[in-house]
């Protein structure tokens, strides 16, 4: 599982960025259109819609296995998936988008009000490439779990 920062485990740095949020919002709207047009699935910003997002991720992984696209070719898909996940979380659980710095690398990610950092684009990319080992529904459920329930 991708590491999550907590106050007790300072792995990285976070810098809020409104532009990253606007980009993620746009990609999440693209995801809603993509789900509707390609799969006939309605995404409604609810936690329950994550089941449908995982179904779409299954299909994208199958396409990936058959065609082996380049990282640049899958980028729009993992950005849509990850942005939708992040936007559900942001809207329902008080998080913000910005830049995460980890081991000197900087990439778009999120911070929950409690200080936990996570990067839904990276998880969505892993799901497309690796398959069910990186299940997005389980990832989202993990993010939503109360802190006292986490390992």
What are these regions (language model features)?
Residues 109-151:
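A recognition module on extended beta-rich or small alphabeta surfaces enriched in W/G with H and D/E
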